[in-house]
């Protein structure tokens, strides 16, 4: 059977309480100058993501949407390599200056780093 690489509703953090659970005490983090990823284990058997790009970091809606689109696309392609964690991605200062290729490289690096740290966390507990 072939694994789906879609990005459906079940792969997203939808409510403020989902986000708050991750923000309250994330055991796993992956950080670069432009992006922070926070992760907390879930019991669902698959990862979920939530994306935050504030107006302070990206003034124009077109920039915020471009950043969110890149994040969702890199997650969609890597979702089967990521353990069952709820993940919040936070855009930081200067992310707007990154073009799509640089942003994609940064995100791919962070997904690898996060997946490795999540697996290490699971093996410890």
UniProtKB/Swiss-Prot annotation:
GO cellular component term, pick one: ribonuclease P complex
Any single Pfam family the record assigns to this protein: Ribonuclease_P
Recorded catalytic activity of this chain's protein: Endonucleolytic cleavage of RNA, removing 5'-extranucleotides from tRNA precursor
Highest taxon of source: Bacteria
Protein's GO biological process: tRNA 5'-leader removal
Broad class of enzyme this protein falls into: hydrolase
GO function term, MF aspect, one: tRNA binding
Enzyme Commission numbers on file: 3.1.26.5
Similarity remark: Belongs to the RnpA family.
Subunit relationships: Consists of a catalytic RNA component (M1 or rnpB) and a protein subunit.
Task of the protein: RNaseP catalyzes the removal of the 5'-leader sequence from pre-tRNA to produce the mature 5'-terminus. It can also cleave other RNA substrates such as 4.5S RNA. The protein component plays an auxiliary but essential role in vivo by binding to the 5'-leader sequence and broadening the substrate specificity of the ribozyme.
HAMAP family the UniProt entry points to: RNase_P
Protein name: Ribonuclease P protein component
Organism: Idiomarina loihiensis (strain ATCC BAA-735 / DSM 15497 / L2-TR)
Gene: rnpA
């Amino acid at each position: 059977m072939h694994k789906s690489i879609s990005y459906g509703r079940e792969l997203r953090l939808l409510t403020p309480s989902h986000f708050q659970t991750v923000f309250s005490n994330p055991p796993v983090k992956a950080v670069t100058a432009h992006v922070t990823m926070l992760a907390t284990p879930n019991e669902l058997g698959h990862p979920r993501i939530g994306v935050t790009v504030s107006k302070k970091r990206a003034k124009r809606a077109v920039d915020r949407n471009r950043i969110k689109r890149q994040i969702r696309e890199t997650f969609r392609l890597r979702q089967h390599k990521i353990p069952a964690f709820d993940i919040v991605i936070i855009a930081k200062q200067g992310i707007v200056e990154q073009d799509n290729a640089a942003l994609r490289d940064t995100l791919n690096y962070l997904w690898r780093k996060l997946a490795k740290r999540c697996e290490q966390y699971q093996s410890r507990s």
